[in-house]
Structure formats: C-alpha cells, structure tokens
Amino acid sequence: VERPPVWLMRQAGRYMKSYQNLCEKYPLFRERSENVDLVVEISLQPWKVFKPDGVILFSDILTPLPGMNIPFDIVKGKGPVIYDPLRTAAAVNEVREFVPEEWVPYVGQALNLLRGEVKNEAAVLGFVGAPFTLASYCVEGGSSKNFSKIKRMAFAEPAILHNLLQKFTTSMANYIKYQADNGAQAVQIFDSWATELSPVDFEEFSLPYLKQIVDSVKETHPDLPLILYASGSGGLLERLPLTGVDVVSLDWTVDMAEGRKRLGSNIAVQGNVDPGVLFGSKEFITKRIYDTVQKAGSQGHVLNLGHGIKVGTPEENVAHFFEVAKGIRY
C-alpha cells in the first residue's frame, strides 16, 4: 500500500451536525440503532463527507442483549442501563444463546445495504463486544467506576462468571460470522473493560474467551480480519496477540513505536492518535498524524484514533484529519 488506510472510531455520531439533526427527529438511541434505514443513513454520514477507507456499522455492543434475554436501554446522560443485573447462578441460567437472524435482522440488512452503497471504495466494518466487557455491563447493571460487582463474582463465585462468559463467547462468535456473511469485510472486537483486570485475571476471564471466538471464526471465515480494541491496554499488550487476532488497536497512552516493539512484527496495528488532538490546530493535527504514521512504519498499520471521537470535536478538524491522512505517501 502507498499509505495507511484510515477510519475513525465513532466517526458517525454526536460531533456531526447531521447526526444531531437526526437525534432531534429520533430521540431514542435504540430506535436509531435498530431501524435499518436509520442505521444505514447514520453509518453513511461520515462516508459522504470524509470518504474514510472504512465504514463502520452504526450500532452498539449491547445490541444483542435483548436477544439473549437481557433487557437493556440507553438512557440519555446515563448511558446503558441493564434493568435486572445478572448476579446469581439462576439469573445467568436464564441467559439464552444469541441467534442474530432472529433478533437483529436489521444488522444483516444494514450491512448488505452499506456494501451496495460504498461499493469497493471502502471496507464495511462490523463489530461486537467481548465477553468480559459484556458481562461487566450485565453484572454491574451499566457502566461502572470500580467494577466491584463483577470482581466480586469473579473472585468469590468464578463458576457463575465463567458460565456467563461462555454464553457470550458462543454468541459473539456466531454474531461475527453473521456480520461477515452479510457483508462485513472486517470485524472489530471491543474489550473496553478487560483492562480493569490484572494480567493474571485477564488470562483467566478474558484471554481464553477471546481466543475461542477467534478460533471459531477462523474455522469458517479464515480470511476475515479481526481487530481487537481494549482502551488502556498498556499493561496487557504482550498478551493481546495471544488471542490470535490480526490487528491490535492501540490507545494513545501507549507510544506507537514502543507498542509495535512490544507486540512483535507478526501483527498489524491500528491507531492511535489521542482523540483530544482533534481539538488542536490544523498544524498540530498534521504533526501528530505524521508522528504516528512514522512510528508505525509502512507495514500493517491502520491509521485511527486511540479511542472514539469526542463530542464537541469540530467537524472541520475531522475533515482535516482525513485530508492529511489520505495525502500521506510512504
């Protein structure tokens, strides 16, 4: 390749005026993320303006939960709320395996439509939540500051947590395959909360399940690139390639050159510009892009942020980011 491909996490979303306008018309997040036409329209908003190399499905990692018998909602200003947190063996036994065709047909339809829209000008990306992160939401009842409930389960009743993690593992492997069968050309796995675990606990409660997902997907879809993103993963970096994923997405708290060294040469990287950089001057943004690309080298790098675009980011700065990125030549 002559330059690194580029897309941005949360490239569709609240920093865009076109998205804000849509939110006024459709105030409920679940409606915006579960209606085919809206999902396609929102996913394409950044594509129409910036022409990124990757167009990621507009969705949420919790979208499969109702299909697993776990009701949830996303409440404005509060984030995700799981109404009946899973805290007992009996509650976990009620969790069903996820059948995407039955519960989220709009995801498959949206991916197919996105492929038709972007043709071969960009890759269509799908995504799923990782088992430990999904379990964290479901046990905590939503987002958490200290993760004491999931850790109580992990350390006092590990068998219950392993049962839940296994259900999410089987379900997410199926969900990735479903997305690939409907047009996703790469899938990113978000394990946002795995970095709350110590390395030894990551090796028990996250790593084996991620590896199982990757192994299962590679059996049926050997050529589907899988990306793993876990924010704050500096303490776990060397362990991430053991999952078998093709790409590790680094957050900005790890220096790109050091991250590459620590990951080894057999794995591609994605990232890792600090999203806050997009509040800087255009010169500053340019400098940071070049810095990141130089440190990543010319092999196996997807340019991205180290986390999602922040609300309030000036759209013109995002436009500048893409312009500079697409002008790079190795």
Curated annotation (Swiss-Prot):
PROSITE patterns xrefs: UROD_1 (PS00906), UROD_2 (PS00907)
Pathway assignment: Porphyrin-containing compound metabolism; protoporphyrin-IX biosynthesis; coproporphyrinogen-III from 5-aminolevulinate: step 4/4
Transition state stabilizer (site feature) positions: 60
Protein's UniProt keywords contain Cytoplasm: no
One MF term in the entry's GO annotations: uroporphyrinogen decarboxylase activity
NCBIfam families: hemE (TIGR01464)
The name this protein goes by in its record: Uroporphyrinogen decarboxylase
Organism expressing this protein natively: Hordeum vulgare (Barley)
